[in-house]
C-alpha cells in the first residue's frame, strides 16, 4: 500500500488526550507529558499519533507529526461505512456499524474524534473492553483499516457484486 502524503491533504488536528506521566528518580518525580492526537481531512483520510515531551505544546507537535506519518484511507459508502466491523487494539475493542443517513456520529469521545476527522457522518459505535483513550483510538483505526467495499471483495473473489450480494 502506497504511503499517503500529508502535505497534499488539508488536515485538521484534534487533541484527544494529554496525560501527565511521572518517572520516579532518586531526587523525586520527573514529570513529562504524552499527547494523543488525531488528524484527518474529513474526506476519508485519518491518522493517529502519540507525542511525548517535557512540555505540553511540544508533545502535541510530536503527536501531530506522528499522526501524519500514520495516515490511512477509509472506504466510505456515502456518509457511512460499507459494513459492520470490530477493531481490536490491546484490550480495547470498538464495534463500528453503518447507519442510515441523518443518524449522526453515535460514539464516545476518543472514537468520535477519529470518525469525525475521517469525515464519517453517520455511524453507530460501541466501545467494548478497555476505556483507555489510546486503545480506543487505535482500535477504531484498526477497524477502519479492515473495511472493504463490496466491489473490492467481489474483485478479490473473482465474482460480480450481484453474485456476492445475491
From Swiss-Prot:
It holds the Pfam family Ribosomal_S5_C. Disulfide bonds: none annotated. Keywords: Ribonucleoprotein, Ribosomal protein, RNA-binding, rRNA-binding. The keyword Protein biosynthesis does not apply. Part of the 30S ribosomal subunit. Contacts proteins S4 and S8. The N-terminal domain interacts with the head of the 30S subunit; the C-terminal domain interacts with the body and contacts protein S4. The interaction surface between S4 and S5 is involved in control of translational fidelity. This is Small ribosomal subunit protein uS5. The gene is rpsE.
Amino acid at each position: 500500500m502506497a504511503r499517503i502524503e500529508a502535505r497534499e491533504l488539508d488536515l485538521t488536528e484534534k487533541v484527544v488526550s494529554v496525560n501527565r506521566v511521572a518517572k520516579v528518580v532518586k531526587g523525586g518525580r520527573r514529570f513529562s507529558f504524552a499527547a494523543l492526537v488525531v488528524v484527518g481531512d474529513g474526506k476519508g483520510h485519518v491518522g493517529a499519533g502519540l507525542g511525548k515531551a517535557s512540555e505540553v505544546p511540544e508533545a502535541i507537535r510530536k503527536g501531530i507529526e506522528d499522526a501524519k506519518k500514520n495516515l490511512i484511507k477509509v472506504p466510505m459508502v456515502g456518509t457511512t461505512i460499507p459494513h459492520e466491523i470490530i477493531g481490536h487494539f490491546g484490550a480495547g475493542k470498538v464495534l463500528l456499524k453503518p447507519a442510515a443517513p441523518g443518524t449522526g456520529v453515535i460514539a464516545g469521545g476518543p472514537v468520535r474524534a477519529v470518525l469525525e476527522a475521517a469525515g464519517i457522518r453517520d455511524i453507530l459505535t460501541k466501545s467494548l473492553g478497555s476505556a483507555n483513550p489510546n486503545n480506543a483510538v487505535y482500535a477504531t483505526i484498526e477497524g477502519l483499516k479492515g473495511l472493504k467495499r463490496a466491489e473490492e471483495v467481489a474483485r478479490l473473489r473473482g465474482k460480480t457484486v450481484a453474485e456476492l450480494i445475491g
